[in-house]
Amino acid sequence: MMDFWTAFQAIILGVVEGLTEFLPISSTGHQIIVADLIGFGGERAMAFNIIIQLAAILAVVWEFRSKIFEVVFGLTNQPKARRFTGNLLLAFMPAVVLGVLFADLIHEYLFNPVTVAAALVVGGVIMLWAERREHRVEVDHVDDMRWSHALKIGFIQCLAMIPGTSRSGSTIIGGLLFGLSRKAATEFSFFLAMPTMVGAAVYSGYKYRDLFQPGDLPVFALGFVTSFIFAMIAVRALLKFIANHSYAAFAWYRIVFGLFILATWQFGWVDWSTAHG
């Protein structure tokens, strides 16, 4: 039976994951801070994180289900659908190759507060620069992307293996720098998240399969539902926001949050020694 405090922890972390996973502000840093504040850690937390990340990506699948069906059923007779699928697979492959080769090394040597904070601040500065530079739009819709756009964004996504970089942040900034409109860059980031995050969740789920215990099912289910709902809210809100605003607000938030993380480490406010990513 799940007690009130455990239910509260599951809901809070589900909300944090759902709201931050697809915003360019690094869900990793937020999860570590909040989990430490509410005392949710250990092996159970590692398994729980896999579940709520899977819920977040399924929210995106649901939100873009019409486009997904259009592409799937158009593969046999629509060049546009085949080109989009090819671009998605091309952008996905660099993360697969580099992830398999370097994921464990990165988690061992780079998962620390200094790296997370530096990645947040540097990413924020680059985001400000990308927004303020003259932006020549070559692609206004994801269906019009060329393979070269997809491949470059795929390599940029690999930077998100560095904790604090933010997967969505790196792909969105990359899209803007390579000539995509804000809408196209954001939507392609969402679509690219589907195979990337599902693949990562399956890999992590298999690697840490011994951590999943039947008694944790109620906690996992509550976190899953919460993460799903708030991820959907975040995705819809972001798409509406970028229609009339730049990413500057997120950039400044990253910089401030990065400095805050440095403070939590410097003054011992958060126990970073138990962080697993």
Curated annotation (Swiss-Prot):
Q: Which GO terms describe its biological process?
A: cell wall organization; peptidoglycan biosynthetic process; regulation of cell shape; response to antibiotic
Q: Which GO terms describe its molecular function?
A: undecaprenyl-diphosphatase activity
Among its keywords, does the record have Transferase?
no
* Pfam families linked to this entry: BacA
**Mode of membrane association:** Multi-pass membrane protein
Question: What InterPro entries does the record tag this protein with?
Answer: UppP
Annotated localization:
Cell inner membrane
Q: So what does this one do?
A: Catalyzes the dephosphorylation of undecaprenyl diphosphate (UPP). Confers resistance to bacitracin.
Catalytic reaction(s) noted? di-trans,octa-cis-undecaprenyl diphosphate + H2O = di-trans,octa-cis-undecaprenyl phosphate + phosphate + H(+)
Transmembrane residues, as ranges?
A: 44-64, 86-106, 110-130, 184-204, 215-235, 250-270
Query: Per its record, how is this protein called by name?
Result: Undecaprenyl-diphosphatase
Q: What is its main location?
A: membrane
One Gene Ontology CC term in the entry: plasma membrane
Which class of enzymes does this protein belong to?
Answer: hydrolase
